[in-house]
Amino acid sequence: MYAVVKTGGKQYKVSEGDFLKVEKLEGAVGDTVEFSEILMVGGDKVVIGTPLVPSASVVGKIVEQGKDKKILVFKSKRRKNTRKLNGHRQLRTILMIEKINA
């Protein structure tokens, strides 16, 4: 069984036992998180939401809180010898999907 979950402005296809890297979620390591915005549930019978599937949810456990790899942002203006280099590390949460309720 699988589901399509919407979180952090993005959509993820998940199954039970999957590890999922998403935008930062509040909570400590070991806490459970429940997603109620389920767009689709699949398995023997596929249910597509309009826009959400009613009474469906996905439960996951927070495995790790941390930062992603560094992204370098380089800006320059031509012929002016003006350069700017910035680095950015996005906060992220790693989840383990425990249960899909459909």
Curated annotation (Swiss-Prot):
Q: Name one GO molecular function term.
A: rRNA binding
Database matches in PROSITE patterns: RIBOSOMAL_L21
Sorted alphabetically, which keywords does the UniProt record give? Ribonucleoprotein, Ribosomal protein, RNA-binding, rRNA-binding
SUPFAM superfamilies annotated for this entry? L21p-like (SSF141091)
For biological process, the GO terms are: translation
Which InterPro entries is this protein grouped with?
Answer: bL21-like, bL21-like_sf, Ribosomal_bL21, Ribosomal_bL21_CS
Pfam families, per database record? Ribosomal_L21p
Q: Which cysteines are joined by disulfide bonds?
A: none
Q: Which domain of life is it from?
A: Bacteria
- Example of a GO cellular component annotation carried by this entry: cytoplasm
NCBIfam families in the record, alphabetically?
L21
Family assignment? Belongs to the bacterial ribosomal protein bL21 family.
PANTHER family in alphabetical order: 50S RIBOSOMAL PROTEIN L21 (PTHR21349), LARGE RIBOSOMAL SUBUNIT PROTEIN BL21M (PTHR21349:SF0)
**What is known about its subunit structure?**
Part of the 50S ribosomal subunit. Contacts protein L20.
**What does the UniProt function comment say about this protein?**
This protein binds to 23S rRNA in the presence of protein L20.
Protein's name in the database:
Large ribosomal subunit protein bL21
Biological source species: Geobacter sp. (strain M21)
